[in-house]
Amino acid sequence: MQRYQVWNPHPDAMPAVNIIEIVERSAGLRILVQEYETDRLLAIFFDTHEAYQRRNESWVAGEASRTDGLGKGSYYVVENSSFIARFFAESLLPRKGIRHFSIITDSLCMDILATENPRTEYVKK
């Protein structure tokens, strides 16, 4: 069974966010989130990522019944990840040390597989 552990991407990060923008470039993956309580924008940069998937909010209800630990904010690291298992099954060169980061909001869910923690910084509107 997948288990969701709360992840804090930044010491000042608020738990409830909305994903504003997703940009993938050769320099990596950038996810821009807006905090509900403060309206601040937090940029989350994955300099290297192996894979990511984006799902709509209808996924959350079904996933919550099959997992442990959801409902404690927007940011998680997933243990016993089915996404990692699927990635290894379909990949020609399985990698070591891959972690599954998940950002879950009211309208969008992002799952990112990466070997390093992302960089984060607050940005101006």
What are the roles of these predicted feature ranges?
Residues 1-125:
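Surface-exposed, interaction-prone regions used to assemble/regulate multi-protein complexes
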